[in-house]
Amino acid sequence: MTTLLAAGWPVLITALVLGYACGAIPFGLILTKFAGLGDVRTIGSGNIGATNVLRTGRKGLAAATLLCDALKGTLPVLAASHWGEGPALAAGLGAFLGHLFPVWLGFKGGKGVATFIGVLLALSPVTLAAFAAIWLGLAFALKYSSLAALAASAATPLILWALGHGAVAALFLVLAALLWWKHAPNIRRLAAGTEGRIGKKG
């Protein structure tokens, strides 16, 4: 704990705020408007993330949204890491909170999977590989993207802890809990058997 706080509270708070500012950039909304598709919040789930952007029928735009939403988790963490581990973790938390609760959109943001991945890429690429393996395996086997993401996110702090990254594991325990909370509608649909499957239309 002492090591994490070594940079001092001003630096930690600065990293948190800068991370939030990056995370709060609503790329899904910006890209769809720039492409002349209007407000992505008026279609599908009303979410600003890549999955809902995909419902516009523009796969390239959805891929760009996914990449941008991931990078807004990766870049602040890498930048803040020059100040130490504590600021890097603070920047990751800030970026994730910014994506979920962007001040510009009345604190109504995305569900966090892409930004979760982006932060994980910066802090533990090895764990990201495990996340991807879990997600891809379950998505291929069960055809539920949301279930695969939920399972992979839940496994992430356990994997980090097993690898000896205690502080990072603690951060991702918080991020995973928030991600699950944002996926509450998906969880209810999974329980009811009404969640949409990968590749199924209608």
Swiss-Prot record:
Family according to the record: Belongs to the PlsY family.
The organism named in the record is Methylorubrum extorquens (strain CM4 / NCIMB 13688)
To which pathway does this protein belong? Answer: Lipid metabolism; phospholipid metabolism
Q: Which GO terms describe its biological process?
A: phospholipid biosynthetic process
**Catalytic activities:** an acyl phosphate + sn-glycerol 3-phosphate = a 1-acyl-sn-glycero-3-phosphate + phosphate
GO function term, MF aspect, one: acyl-phosphate glycerol-3-phosphate acyltransferase activity
* Name of the encoding gene: plsY
**SMART domains listed in its UniProt record:** G3P_acyltransf
Membrane-crossing residues? Answer: 11-31, 87-107, 116-136, 158-178
InterPro entries on file:
G3P_acylTferase_PlsY
Q: How does it sit in the membrane?
A: Multi-pass membrane protein
* Top-rank EC class of the record's enzyme: transferase
Q: Which domain of life is it from?
A: Bacteria
Subunit-structure text? Probably interacts with PlsX.
User: What is the protein's name according to its record?
Assistant: Glycerol-3-phosphate acyltransferase
| GO-annotated cellular components | plasma membrane
Q: According to its UniProt record, where is this protein located?
A: Cell inner membrane
Instruction: For this UniProt record, give its keywords in alphabetical order, as a comma-separated list.
Output: Cell inner membrane, Cell membrane, Lipid biosynthesis, Lipid metabolism, Membrane, Phospholipid biosynthesis, Phospholipid metabolism, Transferase, Transmembrane, Transmembrane helix
